[in-house]
Amino acid sequence: MEGAVIPYAVGVDIACRMKLSILDLPPATLDDKFNLYKEALEGGTRFGIGSVHETPKDHPVMDQDWNVTRITREKKDVAWSQLGTSGSGNHFAEFGVLSLPELDSELGLEAGQYTALLSHSGSRGTGAAVCSSYSAMARSRLPRKYENLAYLAWLSLDSQEGQEYWSAMNLMGDYAAANHDVIHKLVSKLLGAKIIAGVENHHNFAWKEIHGGRELIVHRKGATPAGAGQLGVIPGSMASPAFVVRGKGNAESLNSASHGAGRRMSRKQAKEKYTWKAVQQDLEKKGVKVLFAGADEVPGAYKDIEEVMREQADLVAVVARFDPRIVKMCSDGSQAED
């Protein structure tokens, strides 16, 4: 799109993000010290739509200008209380084994297997409030002849509202990154581990990019940047691998790739088809211990990530594979934030 942004095409969970941290602990400790890993996940983040930390966490993002819009100003205290929390829906924090087949100089890692922490979450309640407010503004300004495109209503970046949304969206990007930073630092501290390398990337965002000689606003909802040489993480499900990838810069896809496996069925269908207890028992047989989760997030609700990766081999190259071993998600029935 040229010169305009579509708030709803960015999405409710603005700047939802993946972050992978490689730790200095051997993979064998995932079994040998399971209780320590469990306590680190349970103490290091909170799940649920209204989840907060008992004591607000410190991060430089809270010193940024939150007065860029009325919504961000009014929601700053809520955002601070939710800093370092994970929310609901398909958001997770998990430990697993990262398999790197060959030396990667950018990661600074030799070939081998590593213990790693992977998280998926975004800008929490404040991001949702920004989306709701500016999507409503965009719809109210939509010419009548386009009324059938209500959820694709746009804001011109030459307008005050468009500039406000753009500033708020970028603040939410910084806030989402800070969320993951707080989670990973706290979890690794509770674990007594050192972070030796990492990869992160976000989706549900809009970027100003040059394509075909024109500046465009590229919206990636459910997609992630995959520019030439750009590192990222593409997850599967709680029982299937995630992949560290390096973008190939495919112009036809606007330098983009899928941000995950994607669902094969709705949450309602998953709850009707699967019982959580049976799924949990099956996962344990496969070596995956799930601390908390809901039936709507079972592996069967998702597409085959291996097939998805084969289908986008022209978009990204696989660098490493992450296999989940200890998983935590929301299990309190909260409305999905993703």
Residues covered by each model-derived region:
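A domain-level signal for the structural core that forms small-molecule/cofactor-binding pockets
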Residues: 10
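Domain-length cofactor-binding catalytic modules of enzymes
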Residues: 3-7, 15-18, 32-52, 60-338
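Short glycine-enriched, charge-decorated loop/helix-capping segments at active-site entrances
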Residues: 25
